[in-house]
């Protein structure tokens, strides 16, 4: 048995007969071994006696922050991980927290240095940027780490049952609670879950990643969550990267801890919106104020229609005015346009994508791809009749499935979407506040709303836009 700061740490489930291969022993065992070395060195570098009189109780209630009817999100500041290496080169904790504060109930900060390139110095940077509780996420084996975390303004800690035995857990949790800090208790299998229940954990994180071999299995949340008693807050951790996963797993969990899927995206704001709400587009924008309304409601994309027969047609000058309203990712909608016209428009407006709404074939798409800016995607709208059209075009990143040629306000038979792979599909046609919730459950990447959120063609209704996005967040 080892003693670290007076707390037993004999109970790591590593190197024991519970672990069935040398490889799986190694990952967690090595991390814990290195953490013991780190703790010993840090105690010499920054003794508790030097700062213990400056430690104050947390004023941000982690447990309360995770209560309520809505699904909650703990969003994570993570520079690197053992499975992926460096995830975010341009890692600025305060900047990241400045985005997260609009969406998160709590914010997690990786502080492990060796495996996650974290730092305790990140904690006060994040704490100063937000009002939410800040979770110190580390391999905690010693009371000293908890005291250090609180000194650096953490409001909660992670305790991993794969690392701690019951006695060590109880003592470490007591230290955290004595500082008014919350505890996220992590379990990754049925045995650890039963221990969490016995130990009276208030918030249980079900880790979908097996730390012994770093594999991901989202079924772990589906299988383990129903075993937890009423009153326990359930957080699903690891492997969550899509809105459809959030909607489906929200039946089992009260919330999600998400890090890698967000940290790997250059546009963090858009990345959070994709996971929390889907990749949604408000199309047919003609006014800057409507672009702003769409953005603040949670849209990722704004649609600009360059088809002159449309009542929502905009020219380049008008489009610039719309774009000035909000930093959406803008999609230009074209039908049977000259390739050079599409290219020029995409370049002049820095479009994120061009959406082809006519009978543009593979040859047209190939030629267009050659001349478009590399960061401008090609989307193709397809009309859905009695059967699902094929989606086999090369160089097409997204398909928009619509009724007819679009803009009709009519929906097609959504039952045709059953058993379809819809990761690269935006659903359009007749979408509004009354049916967007049902539409969101179909599993598409996002929704494309237009006439259903208007008071007149091209004039968006702020209340209807708000109602759509509020409905998308009810899960």
From Swiss-Prot:
Residues 1-279 are annotated as: Indole-3-glycerol phosphate synthase. Residues 280-475 are annotated as: N-(5'-phosphoribosyl)anthranilate isomerase. Pfam families: IGPS, PRAI. The keyword Lyase applies. It catalyses: N-(5-phospho-beta-D-ribosyl)anthranilate = 1-(2-carboxyphenylamino)-1-deoxy-D-ribulose 5-phosphate; 1-(2-carboxyphenylamino)-1-deoxy-D-ribulose 5-phosphate + H(+) = (1S,2R)-1-C-(indol-3-yl)glycerol 3-phosphate + CO2 + H2O. InterPro entries: Aldolase_TIM, Indole-3-glycerol_P_synth, Indole-3-glycerol_P_synth_dom, Indole-3-GlycerolPSynthase_CS, PRAI_dom, RibuloseP-bd_barrel. The keyword Glycosyltransferase does not apply. Pathway: Amino-acid biosynthesis; L-tryptophan biosynthesis; L-tryptophan from chorismate: step 3/5; Amino-acid biosynthesis; L-tryptophan biosynthesis; L-tryptophan from chorismate: step 4/5. Keywords: Amino-acid biosynthesis, Aromatic amino acid biosynthesis, Decarboxylase, Isomerase, Lyase, Multifunctional enzyme, Tryptophan biosynthesis. Its EC number is 4.1.1.48, 5.3.1.24. It comes from the Bacteria. One of its GO terms (molecular function) is phosphoribosylanthranilate isomerase activity. Transmembrane segments: none annotated. Bifunctional enzyme that catalyzes two sequential steps of tryptophan biosynthetic pathway. The first reaction is catalyzed by the isomerase, coded by the TrpF domain; the second reaction is catalyzed by the synthase, coded by the TrpC domain. Monomer. In the N-terminal section; belongs to the TrpC family. In the C-terminal section; belongs to the TrpF family. This is Tryptophan biosynthesis protein TrpCF. The lineage of its organism: Bacteria, Pseudomonadati, Pseudomonadota, Gammaproteobacteria, Enterobacterales.
